[in-house]
From Swiss-Prot:
Gene Ontology molecular function: any one: methionyl-tRNA formyltransferase activity
InterPro entries: Fmt, Formyl_trans_C, Formyl_transf_N, Formyl_transf_N_sf, Formyl_transferase-like_C_sf, Met-tRNA-FMT_C, Met-tRNA-FMT_N
Organism of derivation: Phocaeicola vulgatus (strain ATCC 8482 / DSM 1447 / JCM 5826 / CCUG 4940 / NBRC 14291 / NCTC 11154)
Reaction it catalyzes: L-methionyl-tRNA(fMet) + (6R)-10-formyltetrahydrofolate = N-formyl-L-methionyl-tRNA(fMet) + (6S)-5,6,7,8-tetrahydrofolate + H(+)
Disulfide partners: none
Originating gene: fmt
SUPFAM superfamilies, per database record: FMT C-terminal domain-like, Formyltransferase
Annotated family: Belongs to the Fmt family.
Entry superkingdom: Bacteria
Gene Ontology, cellular component aspect: cytosol
Keyword Membrane: no
Gene3D superfamilies, sorted: 3.40.50.12230
Residues that bind (6S)-5,6,7,8-tetrahydrofolate: S114, L115, L116, P117
Pfam family, one: Formyl_trans_C
Protein name stated in the entry: Methionyl-tRNA formyltransferase
Length: 324
């Protein structure tokens, strides 16, 4: 079979999914349909509809687009079936019902942003950085009933530097993911795929780390942890959705403070956890049990994101100021 004869349906929504679709199109594959989320109401009163990044790219390429509200809707199922896909590819989309992923003769594969079986779930990149991992990766695997558990097709390992935040790791994986999707389709086309069950990669001593969805309360900083854990937590949520805390000032008021970039300072001290140390010009540090978190970039509620020097120009300190 030639590339142009392989009928592919692609499913994805955010920026992360655009690169893989782009590689398929530029690689000469026949993408007969793109499934993405419905346009999102934006602006005042939801008067403006914002298409997904995948839709924007698909429109620019003249690809056929389907935007179902419900993936089990009979009209959508019939339209999807009419595309006569040989293969479906899923990148950062939704959980698919079996009637959808079982439809094409060559199956449906997913690109997942971790080295499966580690970090099954919705936020694998965040959790790898939060946990201080020095390596992550991307995996292509065939879908089956249980989420993120199907047989592995291919994997690529990617280092995580100590200074990488989640945005940097996201972008590394996004571009390498495009390569891996293309390599996986090539392998399926030439019949060289030998899928590996995830169970065969799990040893008795293996600790499987989950990657659950991240909510606002997940992002609250626990200052009772150590310097390294807090540092990794902040970069694992930067720039989005952003780690946050409450800044408590002398008059008893509290303000939500998002923290984007920090440095580790290991030191002995006699300050209380959460107390603030600052010269009011160049540094703003939070005391933790084994040192300080030196805050470099931050944002008060209702204000723009700024560096610490700009923040300190408008900041008033007292002995009672702290974060918690």
């Amino acid at each position: 079979m030639e590339k142009k004869d392989l009928r592919i349906v692609y499913m994805g929504t955010p920026d992360f999914a655009v690169e893989s679709l782009k590689r398929l199109v530029e690689g000469g594959y026949n993408v007969v349909g793109v499934i993405t989320m419905p346009d999102k109401p934006m602006g005042r009163h939801g008067s403006v509809l914002q298409p997904s990044p995948v839709k924007e790219y698909a429109v620019s390429q003249g690809l056929r687009i389907l935007q179902p509200e419900k993936l089990k809707d009979e009209a959508f199922i019939e339209e999807l079936r009419s595309l006569q896909a040989d293969l479906q590819i899923v990148v950062a989309f939704r959980m698919l019902p079996e009637i959808v992923w079982n439809m094409p003769r060559l199956g449906t594969f997913n690109l997942h942003a971790s080295l499966l079986p580690q970090y099954r779930g919705a936020a694998p990149i965040n959790w790898a950085v939060i946990n201080g991992d020095t390596e992550t990766g991307i995996t292509t695997f065939f879908l089956k009933h249980e989420i993120d558990t199907g047989e592995i097709i291919q994997q690529v390992r990617v280092p995580i530097a100590d200074t990488d935040n989640v945005e940097i790791v996201h972008d590394k994986l996004m571009y390498l993911g495009g390569d891996l999707v293309l390599e996986t389709v090539d392998a399926i086309l030439n019949g060289s795929v030998k899928p590996v069950p995830q169970e065969s990669l799990i040893r008795q001593e293996t600790e499987l780390r989950p990657a659950p969805k991240i909510f606002k309360e997940t992002c609250r900083i626990d200052w009772n942890k150590g310097v390294k854990q807090i540092y990794d937590f902040i970069r694992g949520l930067s720039p989005y959705p952003a780690a946050w805390t409450e800044l408590c000032v002398a008059d008893g008021t509290r303000q939500v403070l998002k923290i984007y970039e920090t440095e580790k300072v290991f030191a002995s001290h006699e300050m209380n956890i959460g107390d603030i140390r600052t010269d009011m010009k160049t540094y703003f540090q939070v005391a933790v049990k084994d040192g300080f978190i030196n805050v470099l970039t931050l944002q008060l509620a209702g204000k723009k994101r700024m560096n610490v020097a700009d923040f300190l120009r408008g900041y008033r300190t007292s002995d009672n100021n702290k974060v918690e």
